[in-house]
């Protein structure tokens, strides 16, 4: 989960990272009140999860609360690279003497963390990495140890900070490492990390991405989710512990196991080429459990997508036998009742496949069509979706 800047700032403050005052506002009136509370020069910053805010006019320096009101009025509702601005952060102005860059992220290839640091901050890090790779220090960090004081010292030495500044930056990097480790983040980035005219080190603009797989350790992270941009179907699936990703097609997909579901997406896309170019509408993995409740929750999510014209249930029975899956499908349709209106193609194979197919035949539900193979099921689902377009 990617956080907004104001949320990252709050996490930094929670862990002792030095930050400036910042208050989020959703109206010009709130922005003015925030500027009055902070006092002095403030910065009105669009809160969107995308870069390039400044160039798009989403960051303005306000000398008075009245200016903060005017700028908030301009920025709220603005479209920045496809993201609508619903809130701004009113941040205390800073006397910036120097700008630096720091980030720590997950390095999957090396099974470690990677810290990156530069004395040249404020610009796009991708641009710096290409144009002047020598200006960007890269230091491996052990997940077992994290960013210790010794590791932070190694980072600042490789980044070529002067001795005086290095001593001030080191404790800040340790605290940022603490944010990364204790919040189960996959990215913590500060650009810029600044030195003020008084020599103080501040995290001025932060980005944080949290690992959703660690959400069970952080129930408080649920409050950070952005309900204004979340897909309602994905939210419903998450509430039911379903692995669901919405796509842009017309054939709803339900399968057990990520590998099988991915293969099903490919087969449906291939079949759709000869049926009006229909495509998969989603990824939905029900995992090892195919109870009536789980199947009903999955079908409820998929059938709630108006783009879906047909559904393909592709299950290979293993620990969960095919007869249990078939019973789940039949009971799920009973639970959904009149809300289930779209044709469902079911392909079962594996443990107790004959019993499962028999259950579906005996149910004789008007929405259910069975298929013996994945290819045949995908072809039928694509055909039905095309006919309903």
Curated annotation (Swiss-Prot):
Required cofactor(s): Mg(2+)
Top-level taxon of origin: Bacteria
List of residues binding Mg(2+): 191, 205
Any one Pfam family match given in the protein's UniProt record, by short name: ATP-grasp_2
Enzyme nomenclature, EC number: 6.2.1.5
Domain ATP-grasp: 9-236
Entry's cofactor comment: Binds 1 Mg(2+) ion per subunit.
A GO CC annotation given for this chain: cytosol
Pathway in which this enzyme or protein is active: Carbohydrate metabolism; tricarboxylic acid cycle; succinate from succinyl-CoA (ligase route): step 1/1
Binding site for ATP: 45, 52-54, 94, 99
UniProt entry keywords in alphabetical sequence: ATP-binding, Ligase, Magnesium, Metal-binding, Nucleotide-binding, Tricarboxylic acid cycle
HAMAP family membership: Succ_CoA_beta (MF_00558)
Function: Succinyl-CoA synthetase functions in the citric acid cycle (TCA), coupling the hydrolysis of succinyl-CoA to the synthesis of either ATP or GTP and thus represents the only step of substrate-level phosphorylation in the TCA. The beta subunit provides nucleotide specificity of the enzyme and binds the substrate succinate, while the binding sites for coenzyme A and phosphate are found in the alpha subunit.
Family: Belongs to the succinate/malate CoA ligase beta subunit family.
Subunit structure, as described in the record: Heterotetramer of two alpha and two beta subunits.
PANTHER family: SUCCINATE--COA LIGASE [GDP-FORMING] SUBUNIT BETA, MITOCHONDRIAL (PTHR11815:SF10), SUCCINYL-COA SYNTHETASE BETA CHAIN (PTHR11815)
The protein, known as: Succinate--CoA ligase [ADP-forming] subunit beta
């Amino acid at each position: 989960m990617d956080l907004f800047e104001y949320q990252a700032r709050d996490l930094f403050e929670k862990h002792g990272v030095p930050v400036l005052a910042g208050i989020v506002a959703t109206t010009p009136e709130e922005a003015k009140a925030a500027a009055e509370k902070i006092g002095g020069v403030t910065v009105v910053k669009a809160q969107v999860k995308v870069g390039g805010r400044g160039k798009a006019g989403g960051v303005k320096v306000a000398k008075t609360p009245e200016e903060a009101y005017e700028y908030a009025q301009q920025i709220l509702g603005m479209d920045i690279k496809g993201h609508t601005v619903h809130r701004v952060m009113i941040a205390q102005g800073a006397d910036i003497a120097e700008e630096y860059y720091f980030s720590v992220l997950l390095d999957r290839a090396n099974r470690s963390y990677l810290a990156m640091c530069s004395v040249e901050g404020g610009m796009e890090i991708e641009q710096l990495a290409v144009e002047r790779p020598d200006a960007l220090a890269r230091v491996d960090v052990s997940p077992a140890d994290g960013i210790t004081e010794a590791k932070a010292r190694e980072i600042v030495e490789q980044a070529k900070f002067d001795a005086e500044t290095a001593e001030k930056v080191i404790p800040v990097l340790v605290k940022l490492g603490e944010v990364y480790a204790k919040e189960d983040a996959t990215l913590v980035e500060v650009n810029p990390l600044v030195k003020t005219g008084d020599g103080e080190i501040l995290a001025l603009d932060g980005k944080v991405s949290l690992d959703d797989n660690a959400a069970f350790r952080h129930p408080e992270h649920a409050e950070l989710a952005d309900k204004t941009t979340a897909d309602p179907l994905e939210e419903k699936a998450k509430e039911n512990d379903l692995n669901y990703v919405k796509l842009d097609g017309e054939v709803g997909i339900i399968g057990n196991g990520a590998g099988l579901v991915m293969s099903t997406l490919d087969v449906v896309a291939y079949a759709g080429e000869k049926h009006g170019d229909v495509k998969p509408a989603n990824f939905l993995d029900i995992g090892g459990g195919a109870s009536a409740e789980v199947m009903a929750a999955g079908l409820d999510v998929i059938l709630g997508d108006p783009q879906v014209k047909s559904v393909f249930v592709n299950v290979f029975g293993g620990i969960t036998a095919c007869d249990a899956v078939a019973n789940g499908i039949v009971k799920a349709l009973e639970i959904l009742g009149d809300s289930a209106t779209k044709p469902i193609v079911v392909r079962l194979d594996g443990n107790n496949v004959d019993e499962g197919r028999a259950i579906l035949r005996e149910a004789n539900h008007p929405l259910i069509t069975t298929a013996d193979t994945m290819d045949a099921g995908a072809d039928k689902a694509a055909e039905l979706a095309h006919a309903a377009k």
